[in-house]
Swiss-Prot record:
Gene3D superfamilies: Protein N-terminal glutamine amidohydrolase, alpha beta roll. It comes from Xenopus laevis. One of its GO terms (cellular component) is nucleus. The lineage of its organism: Eukaryota, Metazoa, Chordata, Craniata, Vertebrata. It catalyses: N-terminal L-glutaminyl-[protein] + H2O = N-terminal L-glutamyl-[protein] + NH4(+). Its EC number is 3.5.1.122. The gene is ntaq1. Mediates the side-chain deamidation of N-terminal glutamine residues to glutamate, an important step in N-end rule pathway of protein degradation. Conversion of the resulting N-terminal glutamine to glutamate renders the protein susceptible to arginylation, polyubiquitination and degradation as specified by the N-end rule. Does not act on substrates with internal or C-terminal glutamine and does not act on non-glutamine residues in any position. Does not deaminate acetylated N-terminal glutamine. This is Protein N-terminal glutamine amidohydrolase. GO terms for molecular function: protein-N-terminal asparagine amidohydrolase activity; protein-N-terminal glutamine amidohydrolase activity.
């Protein structure tokens, strides 16, 4: 595993994480489930972070699927945020080539960069949902990963679809960056950087 200098030894190791390509929301849900089952006292320190915008076109750098140094343009992406009063904030992203986890400042600087030099159509917003709430409310029947003939566009995870007590499919409510919809808090990238990262990065 990769570990950033000065970073505490994480209990989540990339090779131990359940991962399915192109199902980032479920990968993060499974990370939250692992924390709940193995370190429940830490669950309140973690949040799922959905990254998207109104156009569902967001650039993210340092992705494993990128060609060269450029960004990948996703319709949305999901990462896990760890807020530690002792060690600082860290990001877990199973699709990045950055260390796992990465200090939040490093992830913002290297993977998200800033919106000031990006066309307005591609500017990112982030919905932060506490891990406990995410585990209780998220549901996906994976219908967004089927084509018009009901064939899978990407192979699904090996476990059953995730359901909540209220729903079998509410992914769009998490991807939406309308603060009146869904759960958690919606931030601009600058506001997210101010809240969770180094404030000097927000304006650069």
């Amino acid at each position: 595993m990769e570990q950033a200098a000065g970073e505490p030894s994480p209990f989540l190791v990339r090779s131990d994480c359940l991962y399915t390509s192109c199902y980032c929301e479920e990968n993060v849900w499974k990370l939250c489930e692992y924390i709940r089952d193995h370190r429940p006292c830490l669950l309140e320190q973690f949040s799922a972070v959905f990254i998207s915008n109104e156009n569902k076109m967001i650039p993210i750098w340092k992705q494993k699927s990128a060609k060269g140094d450029g960004p990948v343009i996703w319709d949305y992406h999901v990462i896990l945020l760890h807020e530690s009063a002792r060690d600082g904030n860290f990001v877990y992203d199973l699709d990045t080539i950055l260390p796992f986890p990465s200090p939040c400042n490093t992830y913002i600087r290297e993977a998200l960069k800033c919106d000031s030099n990006i066309h307005c159509d591609f500017r990112r917003k982030l919905r932060v949902v506490g891990a406990h709430e995410f585990l209780q409310t998220f549901a996906s029947d994976r219908s967004h990963m089927r084509d018009s003939s009901s064939n899978w566009t990407k192979p699904p995870p090996p476990y059953p679809c995730i359901q909540s007590a209220e729903s079998t499919m509410n992914l769009d409510d998490f991807i939406s960056m309308n603060p009146e919809v869904g759960w958690g808090t919606v931030y601009s990238l600058a506001a997210f950087t101010e809240r969770f990262g180094d404030t000097t990065l927000a304006s650069h």
